[in-house]
Amino acid sequence: MELVLKDAQSALTVSETTFGRDFNEALVHQVVVAYAAGARQGTRAQKTRAEITGSGKKPWRQKGTGRARSGSIKSPIWRSGGVTFAARPQDHSQKVNKKMYRGALKSILSELVRQDRLIVVEKFSVEAPKTKLLAQKLKDMALEDVLIITGELDENLFLAARNLHKVDVRDANGIDPVSLIAFDKVVMTADAVKQVEEMLA
C-alpha cells in the first residue's frame, strides 16, 4: 500500500501488515490499559494499628468512668489511630507480550490511516527553537491537537513544541499506544515511517 506525502507530489510505499491491518479493539484496549497501569507509581502507604507510634497503655480503666471502654490509643476508631485495612505499596504493572504490543501499535497506526488522522510528510522541522515558528507552521497545516514523530529527535522542534498545548514531539523509538490515540492528528516524517516499519516487522 502507499501513503501520500503531504508536502511532496509523491507517495511512500509501506507494508500492508503495519499500516493496513484490521483494527483489533480488544487487543488495543488490553495494551493501553496495561501501559497506563505500568505508569502508576503505586507508592501509597498507610499504617495499621501495629505500626502507629505511641504507648500501648490502656487510656483509662475499663469500668467506672462513664466513658466508652477503650483499650488503645492506636485503635482505628480513634483520631490519629491506625487504618483498619491499610494501603500498601504495590506494583500495578501488567505483563504484555512483545507480539501483543506490536500488534496493538499496528492496529492503531492502521486505524489512523483509515480515519485520515495520519499525515505523512517528507520532513518536518523549524529553523530555530522558537514556539512562534512552530505555531505558525501548524496553523498553516490546520493542525492543533497533534503528535509529531520524526526519525531522529530534532532539538529545535522539541524546544519549540514544549510550550504549545496539545502538541508533542517524539522520535520513532519513543512512540507508545497511549500517545498515538491521545491526539487528533499524528504527523510522521518519511524516515519515521520507515523506522516504525522496521521496529514492528
Swiss-Prot record:
Keyword annotations from UniProtKB, A to Z: Ribonucleoprotein, Ribosomal protein, RNA-binding, rRNA-binding
Keyword Oxidoreductase: no
UniProt-listed GO biological process terms: translation
Zinc keyword on record: no
Region of interest called Disordered, as start-end residue ranges on this chain: 46-71
GO CC, any one term: ribonucleoprotein complex
Superkingdom: Bacteria
GO molecular-function terms, A-Z: rRNA binding; structural constituent of ribosome
Function text: One of the primary rRNA binding proteins, this protein initially binds near the 5'-end of the 23S rRNA. It is important during the early stages of 50S assembly. It makes multiple contacts with different domains of the 23S rRNA in the assembled 50S subunit and ribosome.
Family, as annotated: Belongs to the universal ribosomal protein uL4 family.
Subunit structure: Part of the 50S ribosomal subunit.
Protein name: Large ribosomal subunit protein uL4
Organism: Klebsiella pneumoniae subsp. pneumoniae (strain ATCC 700721 / MGH 78578)
